[in-house]
Amino acid sequence: MNQDMSIVQLVLHASVVVQAVMLLLLAVSVMSWAAILRKIFSLKKVKSLNDEFEREFWSGTSLNELQAAAMQNAKFAGPMERIFASGMREFQKLRERRIVDHGVVVDGARRAMRASFQRELDAVESNLSFLASVGSVSPYVGLFGTVWGIMHAFTGLASLQQVTLATVAPGIAEALVATAIGLFAAIPAVVAYNRFARDIDRVAIKLETFIEEFSNILQRNAGAQAPSER
């Protein structure tokens, strides 16, 4: 408890600039934790929706039934289901034009799925750049507060005739709190960023694999009246 109070006292006695730096870093830390929690829940939902659709896709349900379900459930569909829907939509549009070259039809569907994939990946990666910025910049902001605080402490000692460690230590300690808060903001952001980046890479690989598998299915069904074969 005494240690907590001493830290509070250090913050209260710090210069205005150092206090502003501390307040900024604390605000950034709160925003960072909010972004981390949102990303945890959103990635969990993305994985769950992708797994659910993938099970349904390989269960034997016809492609037309899957497309109808995707259109009906558009607001709540996951990335994989939306990619599937965009591919099926483009596939059917090109087939209606009675294009003889089936490769052109499949390539068009694949391009539509790749475009949808990029949109989904951009959405999943949202807030990652913020976490990266917090992790890389916060320590330097804290260091700026520390340097400023030390300069302020030594400036205040200029008028003293005798300077001892007991005289200098409080000012330096006040300044070092800024660096500590900067690290407190940066470390969770860096750890979360690395974890999310790995998880998103796995999601991206899974979606790309699905695009290739579905493209092969469309290739086999390009000449059929009602594509359904796996």
Residue ranges and their predicted role:
Residues L12, V16, M22, S126-S129, ...:
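Internal alpha-helical transmembrane segments of multi-pass membrane proteins, especially GPCRs
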Residues M1-R55:
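Hydrophobic membrane-targeting segments
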Residues A175-A189:
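Hydrophobic alpha-helical transmembrane segments of polytopic membrane proteins
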Residues Q9, A132, G145:
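A cross-family signal for key residues in well-ordered alpha-helices
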Residues S48-V141, I150-T164, V191-R230:
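Predominantly long cytosolic amphipathic alpha-helical stalk/bundle segments
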Residues Q161, T167-A175:
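Hydrophobic alpha-helical transmembrane segments and adjacent short intramembrane/lumenal linkers
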Residues L26-V46, L143, I150, A185-I200:
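Alpha-helical transmembrane segments
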Residues S15, W33, L66, F84, ...:
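Residue-level signature of catalytic and energy-coupling elements of molecular machines
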